[in-house]
C-alpha cells in the first residue's frame, strides 16, 4: 500500500508499505496480481507471493476491496469470493467513528465507497453480514472448511 502505517502496523506483516514511485514501478512491471485506488491510497497484492503459494498447493486468502476481488476473479475464475457486509450503513458509520483514526472527510469517502461496493456484492460467491464478529467468523470458517473438504475430494 502507498498509505502510511497506522499505529501498531508492521511493514511486511500488516502490509508492504511502499512509496508512490515504487508502486508505479510494480504496476509497470506487472508485479501485482491486483491493485486498486481505495480511499486516497493504492493497495495491491504481489503476484509472486500468491503464485508461490498456489504452486505449493496452499489455499490463499486475500483481504481486498471489490475492485481487487473482481480483478482476481478475472485472472482466477475458480477463485471463491466472499463479501463481508456491515449490518447497515448506520452501523458502519458508528464503527468508523469509533475507531477514532479517520477524519470527517475520510469517513464520508469510506461510506460513499461502501455504498458502491455493497451494490456489487452479487458478484461474490457468498456474503456474510458482520453483525456479530464471532458469528461472522464462525460462518466464514465453516464456509472455508466446506470448500477445503471439496478440494480434498477432488484430489482423490
Regions found by a protein language model. Give the residues of each.
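Conserved nucleotide-binding/hydrolysis micro-motifs of P-loop NTPases
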Residues: 2-5, 66-68, 86-91, 133-135
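ATP-dependent small-molecule kinase phosphotransfer cores
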Residues: 3-60, 67
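A short acidic, helix-capping loop that chelates divalent metal ions and anchors anionic groups
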Residues: 4-10, 91-94, 100
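Conserved catalytic network of the ASCE P-loop NTPase/AAA+ motor domain
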Residues: 8, 52-55, 73-77, 119-121
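Residue-level signature of catalytic and energy-coupling elements of molecular machines
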Residues: 23, 61, 92, 114, ...
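Conserved phosphate-donor/acceptor-positioning beta-strand/loop module used by diverse small-molecule
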Residues: 60-65, 74-98
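NTP-dependent small-molecule kinase module
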Residues: 78, 94, 98-102, 116-156
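Glycine-rich S-adenosyl-L-methionine
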Residues: 104-113
Amino acid at each position: 500500500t502507498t498509505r502510511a502505517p497506522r499505529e501498531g502496523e508492521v511493514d511486511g506483516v500488516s502490509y508492504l508499505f511502499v512509496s508512490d514511485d515504487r508502486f508505479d514501478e510494480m504496476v509497470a512491471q506487472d508485479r501485482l496480481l491486483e491493485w486498486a485506488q481505495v480511499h486516497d491510497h493504492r493497495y495491491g497484492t504481489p503476484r509472486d507471493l500468491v503464485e508461490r503459494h498456489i504452486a505449493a498447493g496452499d489455499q490463499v486468502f486475500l483481504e481486498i476491496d471489490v475492485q481487487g476481488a473482481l480483478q482476481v476473479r478475472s485472472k482466477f475464475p475458480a477463485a471463491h469470493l466472499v463479501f463481508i457486509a456491515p449490518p447497515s450503513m448506520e452501523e458502519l458509520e458508528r464503527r468508523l467513528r469509533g475507531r477514532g483514526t479517520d477524519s470527517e472527510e475520510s469517513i464520508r469517502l469510506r461510506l460513499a465507497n461502501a455504498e458502491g461496493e455493497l451494490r456489487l456484492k452479487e458478484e461474490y460467491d457468498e456474503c456474510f453480514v458482520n453483525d456479530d464478529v464471532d458469528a461472522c467468523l464462525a460462518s466464514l470458517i465453516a464456509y472455508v472448511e466446506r470448500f477445503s473438504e471439496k478440494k480434498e475430494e477432488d484430489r482423490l
